[in-house]
Each structure stands twice: as structure tokens, then as C-alpha cells.
Swiss-Prot record:
Record-linked Pfam families: HGTP_anticodon, TGS, tRNA-synt_2b, tRNA_SAD
Subunit field text: Homodimer.
Record function comment: Catalyzes the attachment of threonine to tRNA(Thr) in a two-step reaction: L-threonine is first activated by ATP to form Thr-AMP and then transferred to the acceptor end of tRNA(Thr). Also edits incorrectly charged L-seryl-tRNA(Thr).
Keywords: Aminoacyl-tRNA synthetase, ATP-binding, Cytoplasm, Ligase, Metal-binding, Nucleotide-binding, Protein biosynthesis, RNA-binding, tRNA-binding, Zinc
Region span, Catalytic: 242-533
SUPFAM superfamilies: Class II aaRS ABD-related, Class II aaRS and biotin synthetases, TGS-like, ThrRS/AlaRS common domain
Gene for this chain: thrS
Co-factor: note: Binds 1 zinc ion per subunit.
Example GO molecular function: metal ion binding
InterPro entries for this protein: aa-tRNA-synt_IIb, aa-tRNA-synth_II, aa-tRNA-synth_II/BPL/LPL, Anticodon-bd, Anticodon-bd_dom_sf, Beta-grasp_dom_sf, TGS, TGS-like
UniProt name for this protein: Threonine--tRNA ligase
Cofactor(s) for this UniProt protein: Zn(2+)
Length: 640
């Protein structure tokens, strides 16, 4: 006779084992109809699952995040149902939940087209209208194999092979279609009405490019139509802001098939890149960092010592010369230790902060590449701080403050922080981990910012802090990291002479603020929709003449602004002034300076903004002062 304790503390007793759905019905018909699943003693279960003993129960509905994820997972199964009806020879692979949606990987003899995706979506809607129950059957392993063998689902059989210890598995039946899953899933298709398929792409079995290619169908699903409509609106806005489209339109960069994952920077884009690099160089110099430069190609032996060859070789570009193996560096850390190791250091020289705008290359799968956001060749604003254990907290606190200041300069004030602590498998004593975690937590507390604790999510060699930016669309981008490392200095024999004249290994703080220049520029493009603040804009002002008579004065203005350190250019083409204004407005130039006969006579410029505001006529010196103030505010004018 189980007694069920509900979240409000109330209890309900039953004469026999009772399902989650039955408990919901005992509370009310409305709740029963809204029940997606249950959480029994903290564990998610299906609505049909029986509770045989006393337990706590939370009814999960579409309003709960867990309920929304279950809806998305069940929508993936619905994709399978529709695909098998439309394309009977297709073989289903996996269909997990992802951020804001789901996907299903499918093996089929040809690539799916947009017409196929529309047909699949239409069939899914027809299946939902049938309002059928989703039936769960916990099935013995041998019978599961029989089911998928009879259906020629080769990939499902491979997945069963991957779980040799599982003697029974959950099979979920959508009418004639069956899928395998740990669950839980929705009890009925009525919960799946607010969905949309979003895109198609290729994928590889087990994510390995050496394996066969699959079709991936992406979709999104929400609790109701209103949420779905809001999401679609966000996606449409995001598509308008796609950095690939804006980058092409503004002439910033391009990518091409002959160099997958590599960026061709155009003059305007490289100017933007240089602004970022010069800004970060100044910031780091002012905060005690020493800039270095290390080799691109390094012998295999160093990567073996660091552990990268054993754990990361598949992601490294390698080459051979004179019977020696080399790798193009995927990260800068081992090389920075080599710089530290040149000459024995004293504790008086610590902390030592070594920074590099380090060009790295990683052999990312081609299917994962995305514009300049996910590339194979990139540059990090990388630095490593070598310090004593006693200096960990102060260095961490200083880095947190520096990082938040940098983000504010770029217009980002909504920052999410996560602290990841010790995993089960780790190096270093518990006492050292206690001190390291305490140092990071205290540094975060001193910044006065809330953070999410992620127990067990740290690296085996130390805890870490992650910094994520929220952009104008509410999207979260993980950029900065602060990673404590007790392991690499030992592996690569980094030492210093301590106060008692003994040799000790320093603690190594891996840190980056932007992450990679390429990805951060992509984020900036989408956040500002290409309309960068004046300090970042590749061209800050364009001087336009109305007729040829004003050309000489326009060139004088350009020269004056350039000598004052501004990025200005003249447009002296024989075009109507309205045409020129429109063109440079579309190119997102912050300030448009128009010169006619009156401006030449008065030695002024008529100033307009790209938003269309008329700032009136002013002397060139006054405009230069105005522009200097706009530049000095950096990205803070809209955030403070």
C-alpha cells in the first residue's frame, strides 16, 4: 500500500501499486490530462510506470523543463514514425534532445531534400491528429534483437551490442513503429502539436568521418503554439543576423572549399580583427602580461610528454620531415611551459603571466564547421599564469575582474559564470583541490557575481571557471575560461625555487577572455547585426562630396581625421549623394559626412548617422572631438 508524498508535503495512500498517471488523476482530471511523466524520488519515469512503495512524486507537465525535453525526445521518435512510413527502406539511428529541439540521424540511399523535410513534417502532423497512445514495453534483450532484426534496423542492433550488460530495454511503440530508448516519453501524441522541422544536414555514424554518412533531420518542439511562434521569430531574427551573410555583405571575410575551416580576411574584416588584437594587447600589457610568440610546428615528442598525442592526436594536423613526426599546434600551453622553463625561476619572479595571440589548428569534422564560428584555423587570446599556490586566489580574482571589464567594453554586461569542481578521476591531493576550489569560489564571491556550481565537471588536472555571454537575442555563448592546472607543470618539468630554496612545481592558470578571435568576431557581427560601435567599426566615417567642386576639401577632411587616428575614407564617385548615403548606410558606417558648397565655404561637414539622425553641420575639429568621445565609450554607450 504505497503512500505518495507530493511536492507540497501532502500525502495520498493507495491500496496497490499505482501509476504516475493514476496519482495525477486522483488529484484532478485537468492534471491527469497534462501529465507528461513523473519524477519518483528524484528519478524521471513514464506516466505509465507503477509506484509500488512509498515515494515522493512530482508530476511533470509541459510547463516543466523536464517535460519540454520529454516532448522534444518524443518528437524525435515521431520523426522516425513518419520517415518509416514515407521511406520504408530508411534505417533509423539515434534521435537525441539538443538545445531548443532535437534531431534524428537516418541512413538512406540518397540525401533528403527540402521537399522530403516538408513531407516528413506533414506526415508527423497527420500522425499527431490521430491522437494515439505511445505504448511502453520493457522488453528482454533477446526479444529486442528479434524485433530489430525483423525490421532490418541494423543501427539499432549495433546500439544493442553497445550495451552488453542490459538484459531488458525500453521499447516505445508509435502504432506500427517501434523505437528503443531509456525514456521517459509522452503518453500520447497530443503533447507533440507544437513542433517544426528546421533543417537538414549530414552526419557520420558515431561522429567519425571514417564511418558512413547519415542524414540528420533537425526540429524544435515547445509546450504550446505561442512558445513555438516566439522561437520561430527568434530564429528568423538570428538568420537575419547570420554572420556569414553579414560578413559577405560588408566585405569582411569569406571561406571556400579549397581551405575548409580557414578564414580569408578581407581588408575591412582584417581591420576589425586588428582592432581587437591591438585592444587585447593593450589590456594585457596594462595588467602585467608579457607577450611571447611560439612555433606553429612542434615535434611529436613534446606532445607525447604533454599527453596531447595520446588523447588528442585525431584532432591534430601532423606532418613528417627527415624521419621526424611533427604536429601543427592545436593549443599553446605546452609551448608556453617551454618559455617558462628557460632559466630557473625564483618565487620572486612569480606570478609570471605569458600571453600569446597564438594561431592554432584543429582537425574538426567538416560537418561541424560553421562560418568563422567553428573553424580549423584560429587565433586565441591565450595566456598562462605561472604562480604559487598562495597566489591562486589573487590571480583568479584579478582575471575575473579583467574579463568582465573587457566584456563590458564590447557591450556585454549579462554574463553567466560556472564553476566546475573535482571529478572522480583526478591528479593532486584532496587538500590541493580544496585550496584550488576555494580560491576560485572566493575569487567569484569577491566579484559579487552569482555562479552555477557544476560538481564533478572540472578537468582531471584542476577546477575551472567558464564565462558565457548573453547576446541581444538571449543566446548564450561560452567564451572565456580560467582553468587551474596542477598536472602539466609536472609533466613538462616546470619548476621554481621556493622561499625555502626547495624546487616546486608552479600552479598553471590557463586563461582566455575572447576564446578565439574568429568566433568572437562572429558573435560581435551577430550581436550588432554588423552595426559595430564606433571604436570597432572598420570604417568609422565616410566623407562624401555632392559635386566634383568639393573633392579637394573632402580629401583634406579625410587626411585630418586619419592624422587624428580615425579610420576615415572619401567617396568621390560621380554618383548622386542619395545613392552614396544609402550605400554606406547599408555598409553600416557609423558616421556619414556630406560636403556641399556651403560646407566648403564654412569649412564644416554635415554629419549624419547610419541610423538616419541628422547631427547638423560642425567644424571638422568638433566632429573629431565628437568621434573621439564615441570611440572612448567603446561598447558601453548602450549598456550603461
Amino acid at each position: 500500500m504505497p503512500t505518495i508524498t507530493l511536492p507540497d508535503g501532502s500525502q495520498r495512500s493507495f491500496d496497490q501499486a499505482v501509476s504516475v498517471a493514476d496519482v495525477a488523476l486522483s488529484i484532478g482530471a485537468g492534471l491527469a490530462k497534462a501529465t507528461v511523466a513523473g519524477k519518483v524520488d528524484g528519478k524521471l519515469v513514464d506516466a505509465c510506470d507503477l509506484i509500488e512503495n512509498d515515494a515522493s512524486l512530482q508530476i511533470i507537465t509541459p510547463k516543466d523543463q523536464e517535460g519540454l525535453e520529454i516532448i522534444r525526445h518524443s518528437c524525435a521518435h515521431l520523426v522516425g514514425h513518419a520517415v518509416k512510413q514515407l521511406y520504408p527502406t530508411a534505417k533509423m539511428v539515434i534521435g537525441p534532445v539538443i538545445d531548443d529541439g532535437f534531431y534524428y540521424d537516418i541512413a538512406y540511399e540518397r540525401p533528403f531534400t527540402p521537399d522530403d523535410m516538408a513531407a516528413i513534417e506533414q506526415r508527423m502532423q497527420q500522425l499527431i491528429e490521430k491522437d494515439y497512445d505511445v505504448i511502453k514495453k520493457v522488453t528482454p534483450r533477446a526479444e529486442v534483437i528479434e524485433v530489430f532484426t525483423a525490421r532490418h534496423e541494423d543501427y539499432k542492433l549495433r546500439l544493442v551490442e553497445d550495451m552488453p550488460s542490459e538484459q531488458a530495454m525500453g521499447l516505445y511503440y508509435h502504432e506500427e513503429y517501434v523505437d528503443m530508448c531509456r525514456g521517459p516519453h509522452v503518453p500520447n501524441t497530443r503533447f507533440l502539436k507544437s513542433f517544426k522541422l528546421t533543417k537538414l544536414s549530414g552526419a557520420y555514424w558515431r561522429g567519425d568521418a571514417k564511418n558512413e554518412q547519415l542524414q540528420r533531420v533537425y526540429g524544435t518542439a515547445w509546450a504550446d503554439k505561442k512558445q513555438l511562434a516566439a522561437y520561430i521569430q527568434r530564429i528568423e531574427e538570428a538568420e537575419k543576423r547570420d554572420h556569414r551573410k553579414i560578413g559577405k555583405r560588408l566585405g569582411l571575410f569569406h571561406t571556400q572549399e579549397e581551405a575548409p575551416g580557414m578564414v580569408f580576411w578581407h581588408p575591412q574584416g582584417w581591420t576589425l580583427y586588428q582592432v581587437l588584437e591591438q585592444y587585447m594587447r593593450k589590456v594585457q600589457r596594462e595588467n602585467g602580461y608579457l607577450e611571447i610568440k611560439t612555433p606553429q610546428v612542434v615535434d611529436r615528442s613534446l606532445w607525447e610528454k604533454s599527453g596531447h598525442w595520446a588523447n588528442y592526436a585525431d584532432n591534430m594536423f601532423t606532418t613528417e620531415s627527415e624521419s621526424r613526426d611533427y604536429a601543427i599546434k592545436p593549443m599553446n600551453c605546452p609551448c608556453h611551459v617551454q618559455v617558462f622553463n628557460q632559466g630557473l625561476k625564483s618565487y620572486r619572479e612569480l606570478p609570471m603571466r605569458l600571453a600569446e595571440f597564438g594561431a592554432c589548428h584543429r582537425n574538426e569534422p567538416s560537418g561541424a564547421l560553421h562560418g568563422i564560428m567553428r573553424v580549423r584555423g584560429f587565433t586565441q587570446d591565450d595566456a598562462h599564469i605561472f604562480c604559487t599556490e598562495d597566489q591562486m586566489q589573487a590571480e583568479s580574482a584579478a582575471f575575473i575582474k579583467l574579463t568582465l571589464d573587457v566584456y563590458a567594453d564590447f557591450g556585454f554586461k549579462d554574463i553567466e559564470l560556472k564553476l566546475s569542481t573535482r571529478p572522480e578521476k583526478r591528479v593532486g591531493s584532496d587538500e590541493l583541490w580544496d585550496r584550488a576550489e576555494s580560491a576560485l569560489a572566493s575569487a567569484l564571491d569577491s566579484a559579487g557575481l552569482p555562479y552555477d556550481l557544476q560538481p564533478g565537471e572540472g578537468a582531471f588536472y584542476g577546477p575551472k571557471i567558464e564565462f558565457s555571454l548573453k547576446d541581444c537575442l538571449g543566446r548564450v555563448w561560452q567564451c572565456g575560461t580560467l582553468q587551474l592546472d596542477f598536472n602539466l607543470p609536472i609533466r613538462l618539468s616546470a619548476e621554481y625555487v621556493s622561499e625555502d630554496n626547495s624546487r616546486k612545481n608552479p600552479v598553471m592558470l590557463h586563461r582566455a577572455i575572447l576564446g578565439s578571435f574568429e568566433r568572437f568576431i562572429g558573435i560581435l557581427i551577430e550581436h550588432y547585426e554588423g552595426a559595430f560601435p564606433a571604436w570597432l567599426a572598420p570604417t568609422q566615417a565616410v566623407i562624401m562630396n555632392i559635386t566634383d567642386k568639393q573633392a579637394d576639401f573632402a580629401l583634406e577632411v579625410e587626411k585630418t581625421l586619419a592624422e587624428s587616428g580615425f579610420r576615415a575614407k572619401s567617396d568621390l564617385r560621380n554618383e548622386k549623394i542619395g545613392f552614396k548615403i544609402r550605400e554606406h548606410t547599408l555598409l553600416k558606417v557609423p558616421y556619414l559626412l556630406v560636403i556641399g558648397d556651403r560646407e566648403v565655404e564654412m569649412q564644416t561637414v554635415a554629419v549624419r548617422t547610419r541610423e538616419g539622425a541628422d547631427l547638423g553641420s560642425m567644424p571638422v575639429a568638433q566632429f573629431a572631438e565628437f568621434l573621439a568621445q564615441a570611440v572612448s565609450r567603446r561598447g558601453r554607450q548602450d549598456t550603461e
